[in-house]
UniProtKB/Swiss-Prot annotation:
Alphabetical list of CDD domains matching this protein: GIY-YIG_UvrC_Cho
Subcellular locations according to the entry: Cytoplasm
Record note on quaternary structure: Interacts with UvrB in an incision complex.
Protein name per the record: UvrABC system protein C
Species per Swiss-Prot/TrEMBL record: Caldanaerobacter subterraneus subsp. tengcongensis (strain DSM 15242 / JCM 11007 / NBRC 100824 / MB4) (Thermoanaerobacter tengcongensis)
Pfam short name (any one): UVR
C-alpha cells in the first residue's frame, strides 16, 4: 500500500506515529492529538517545512501508527519509543543512557551507596541523573563522610564478626557493619539520614539530628553526641555555601538553554527548601533547525522519563505548546500536582535568568574546549575500536618476577598517546607468596586506587597539596599485560572500590609479540598496520621495560646483599661478579677457576665465594 492510501486510512484519534526509511528503520517518532490531521501535515505544503523536516521526509518510505485512548497516553508512549529507538531525526538527550545516578539499596538489610548508570526495579532509591561521573563520585564521597555507609557487596550476615575493618573504616568512610561495630538499627538510621540529605531535606534533617544529639547528651552518651554534633556541623557548612533563593520552601527544577550551530546546552538548577542544592548540565543533539520551545519540551520528556524523582514545580523561560499535557504526565509520575511555570518578573524570573547566564558561560567553555583539544589520532582510533570516550590518560600495568621471587609491578602512563614518565609508579608486591600474577595484579591495582582515595581525603582536609599527590589523577582507560584472567582481576578490584574505568588486557602471540587487546566481551580486532595497534604495542613494551628494569634493580640489590655476606667481598667485587655472571644462580654454578678469571678477583676472594656456596674445597 502506498503512502497516499495509508494517509486516507488514518483515524481521527490520538496516538503515536513512526516514520520509516527504505530499510524499515524508524527515523522519527511523534505524537498527535488527532493522528489523521498531524501525519497528513507532513505530506502537504512540503515547501513550507523547515529544512530538517524536508531532509527527513526525503528518506521516509513508510509509516506506522499506534492508537491510544488519550493524548496523555500518546505522550507516555512517545517518550518510551524515543528512548527505545533513538530515531535519527528526533531531538535527543545526548547519550542519555549513560548518565550516572547515585543508588542506595534501601531494600537490603544493610544498604549500600553506589554509582550506577542503570535504574532497576529493585526497591532501591535513585538520585540523579547527574551530568558527569565525577559529580556522582564526589557526592557519594561527601555523603559517606557525613553518613558512613558501605559500598561493598560483602554478605553481612555471613561475615559478621569474622572480618576485620577495611581501609574505609579507618579513614571514616564506612561504619564497618560487617564487624558488628554498629547495630543494625543505628546503621539504618545513617542510611535514612543519607537519603534525606540527598532528597534536599537538610533543614528537617538538622533539626532531627539536634534532637538526637540533645537526647544522647542527656543520657550521658557523650561520644554519640559528639558524632551527631560533627554531622550537624558538616551539613550546615554545606548549606551555607548554597545560594538562598527565597522563592518558597518547595522543590523546583529551573531549566534554561543556550545553543550554537550544533550544540544545545541545557542547564538545570535543583532548588530544595529554598536553597540551590545542586546543578547539572546536559547536551541535546539533532537540534538543527529546531526552535527553543521544541528542544526544551523534548528535554523535559526525556529527562523526567528516566529521572527517579519529579519536583513540585519546573521553572522555564519559554512557553510550551504542550504545557498542560506535560503537567498531567509529570503529575502522574510524581503522584501529586506538578506545575510548569514561565515567570515574567520577580524572584523566579531572576533565577531562571541566572540559569540562562550559566548555560551561556558553560556553552562558551565547551566551544573553547573543543577548539583547544587536538586529539591524538592513535588514541582516537583506539577509542573508536573500543567504543569508549577518548581516553586522554591511559594507565598500563605489568607484573615481573622469577619463579615468584622479587615480585614487582609497574604502572606506566600515557597522556594523549605520549608517555608521561613523571607519572610512572613502581610497586613491590608485599602480600602475595609465590608466583600468582592474578593476585599480584589485584594487589597492585588496589593499592594504586586506595592511595588515590587517601590522597583525595588529605587534600580535602588540607593536609596534602594537589601538587604533591602522586596518585590523584584517575585513568580513562586501564590496560593490563595479560589475558582475560588479568582483566577480571583488575575489574574485580575497581568495581569493589566503586570506580568505573574500562579495562582491557594486552595479549601476545606465540612469539611473545603484541597481538591485540582482550576485554570482557572477547578479543578486539585491531588492524596490525593501524595507529591504535602500534600505540598498544608501544604501551605494552614500555610497561614491560619499566617492570623488568625495576625487577632487575631489586634482584641486583638482593644479589649484592648476599655477596656482601662473604668475607673479602665488598661493594666493588660484588658489582664485578654480578656484571660478569648476571645472576646469583650463575655465580653459584661458577667453578673456582672461572671465579679467579673475573677482573678484580684473586685466589683468596674466589675461594671464599666458591666455599660460601659449595663448602670448603
Amino acid at each position: 500500500m502506498d503512502l497516499q492510501e495509508k494517509l486516507k486510512l488514518l483515524p481521527e484519534k490520538p496516538g503515536v506515529y513512526l516514520m520509516k526509511d527504505e530499510e524499515g528503520n524508524i527515523i522519527y517518532v511523534g505524537k498527535a492529538s488527532v493522528l489523521k490531521n498531524r501525519v497528513r501535515q507532513y505530506f502537504q505544503n512540503t515547501d513550507n517545512h523547515p529544512p530538517k523536516v524536508k531532509v527527513m521526509l526525503s528518506h521516509v518510505e513508510d509509516f506506522e501508527y499506534i492508537v491510544t485512548d488519550t493524548e496523555l497516553e500518546a505522550l507516555m508512549l512517545e517518550c518510551n519509543l524515543i528512548k527505545k529507538y533513538k530515531p535519527k531525526y528526533n531531538v535527543l538527550l545526548k547519550d542519555d543512557k549513560n548518565y550516572p545516578y547515585i543508588k542506595i539499596t534501601v531494600a537490603e538489610d544493610y544498604p549500600r551507596i553506589m554509582f550506577t548508570r542503570k535504574i532497576d526495579m529493585d526497591g532501591s532509591k535513585y538520585f540523579g541523573p547527574y551530568g558527569s561521573a565525577f559529580a556522582v563520585r564526589e557526592t557519594i564521597k561527601l555523603v559517606r563522610k557525613m553518613f558512613p555507609i558501605r559500598t561493598c557487596n560483602v554478605n553481612i550476615e555471613k561475615s559478621l564478626g569474622k572480618v576485620r575493618e577495611c581501609l574505609y573504616y579507618h579513614i571514616g568512610l564506612c561504619s564497618a557493619p560487617c564487624t558488628g561495630r554498629i547495630e543494625k538499627e543505628e546503621y539504618r538510621k545513617l542510611v535514612d539520614q543519607a537519603v534525606m540529605f540527598l532528597e534536599g531535606k537538610r533543614e528537617w534533617l538538622v533539626e532531627k539530628l539536634k534532637e538526637e544529639m540533645q537526647k544522647a547528651a542527656d543520657e550521658l552518651r557523650f561520644e554519640e553526641a559528639a558524632r551527631l554534633r560533627d554531622q550537624i556541623f558538616a551539613i550546615e557548612k554545606i548549606s551555607e555555601k548554597q545560594k538562598v533563593t527565597s522563592i518558597n520552601e518547595d522543590e523546583q527544577d529551573v531549566i534554561s538553554m543556550a545553543r550554537s550551530d550544533d550544540i544545545a546546552h541545557i542547564e538545570v538548577f535543583f532548588v530544595r527548601e529554598g536553597k540551590l542544592s545542586g546543578r547539572e548540565h546536559y547536551y541535546m543533539k539533532n537540534t538543527e533547525g529546531m526552535g527553543r520551545e521544541e528542544i526544551i519540551s523534548s528535554f523535559i520528556k526525556q529527562f523526567y522519563e528516566s529521572s527517579p524523582s519529579v519536583p513540585k514545580e519546573i521553572i522555564i523561560d519559554v512557553e510550551l505548546e504542550e504545557k498542560d499535557l506535560l503537567e498531567d504526565w509529570l503529575s502522574q509520575k510524581r503522584g501529586n500536582r506538578v506545575s510548569i511555570t514561565v515567570p515574567l518578573r520577580g524572584k523566579k524570573k531572576e533565577l531562571v535568568d541566572m540559569v540562562y547566564q550559566n548555560a551561556v558561560e558553560a556553552l562558551k567553555n565547551e566551544i573553547l574546549a573543543r577548539e583547544k583539544i587536538l586529539k591524538d589520532p592513535a588514541v582516537l582510533e583506539l577509542s573508536n575500536l573500543l567504543g569508549i570516550e577518548y581516553p586522554k590518560r591511559i594507565e598500563a600495568y605489568d607484573i615481573s618476577n622469577v619463579r615468584g621471587e622479587d615480585n614487582v609491578g609497574s604502572m606506566v602512563v600515557f597522556v594523549d598517546g605520549k608517555p608521561k614518565k613523571s607519572e610512572y609508579r613502581k610497586f613491590t608486591i608485599k602480600y602475595v607468596e609465590g608466583q600468582d600474577d592474578y593476585q599480584s595484579m589485584r594487589e597492585m591495582i588496589e593499592r594504586r586506587f586506595l592511595h588515590a582515595l587517601e590522597e583525595k581525603k588529605q587534600i580535602e582536609e588540607g593536609t596534602l597539596s594537589k601538587e604533591k599527590a602522586k596518585f590523584i589523577e584517575m585513568p580513562d582507560l586501564i590496560l593490563v599485560d595479560g589475558g582475560i584472567g588479568h582483566v577480571n582481576a583488575a575489574l574485580e578490584v575497581i568495581e569493589k572500590l566503586g570506580i568505573s574505568v574500562p579495562v582491557y588486557g594486552m595479549v601476545k602471540d606465540s612469539r611473545h609479540r603484541t597481538r591485540g587487546l582482550v576485554g570482557v566481551s572477547g578479543e578486539v580486532q585491531m588492524p596490525v598496520t593501524g595507529r591504535a595497534f602500534r600505540l598498544v604495542a608501544q604501551i605494552q613494551e614500555e610497561a614491560h621495560r619499566f617492570a623488568i628494569t625495576f625487577h632487575r634493580e631489586r634482584q641486583s640489590k638482593r644479589f649484592k646483599t648476599d655477596l656482601l655476606n662473604i668475607k673479602g667481598i665488598g661493594e666493588k667485587r660484588a658489582k664485578v661478579l654480578y656484571e660478569a655472571f648476571g645472576s646469583i644462580e650463575e655465580i653459584k654454578k661458577a667453578s673456582l677457576e672461572e671465579l679467579k678469571k673475573v677482573k678484580g678477583m684473586n685466589e683468596r676472594s674466589a675461594k671464599a665465594v666458591y666455599e660460601y656456596f659449595h663448602g670448603e674445597v
